Amino acid sequence: MKYIRELNRMIQVKNLSKSFITPRGRIDVLRDMSFSISKGSFVGVTGKSGAGKSTLLSIIAGLQKQDSGSLMINGTELVTYDDKKLSAFRNKNIGFISQEQSFLENFTVLDNVRLPAFIGGKSDDTNVQEITQRANELLDSLGIAHLAQNYPTTLSGGENHRVLIARALINDPPVILADEPTDSVDTEQTQSIIRIFRQLADQGKTILMASHDPEALKLCDGEIKV
């Protein structure tokens, strides 16, 4: 299955498989998957609960390793990297929005958004100012600038989802992976979040979003079924 303009491919997956060993035996979650996604595409990953949507995104994010097959992000074969190089590559090139709203609760919204920019980077005064400015600009673009000094525990589900998007964008990565980003929010919030992803794709970001919600998939360029 392909959603490609042969040039400008951002994500390339070929014959990718992943299984897990459980007390009940081996479970093949992903079997021989192949697809390519071009830069600036907004693609949905669909399938039943437990079908492997989250596993696929986790592998593409470099958080898990496939059993077999190849994966390239922006021309880079991730399996060739050691943990240190992989972490640096991921921080620069991939924004990951997980199902778990994993915030540092004692940090403000602004601090949570800025955090990935400080990982592996300089923290001199000039750099801190630039990062803070970018974080505030992202919060403003997502309509939550007024929440910068709030704490995540005081926010609504929809507001927290926007904070996650801002945090994923802080390093300006070319690829955004979103795992059920509209889970537990109402239809209005779902439409708002999906419009944000659509705009990001139109600006050149490559978006891969796992979802079981037909409403969330309406603005996608295509779907990959697992």
Q: Where are the regions that the model predicts?
A:
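Conserved ABC transporter NBD signature motif
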Residues: 69-77
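Helix-to-loop junction immediately C-terminal to a conserved catalytic motif
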Residues: 61
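Conserved ABC ATPase signature
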Residues: 151-155, 159
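A short, proline-enriched helix->beta-strand linker immediately N-terminal to the Walker B motif
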Residues: 170-174
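Hydrophobic anchor residue at the start of the ABC signature
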Residues: 165
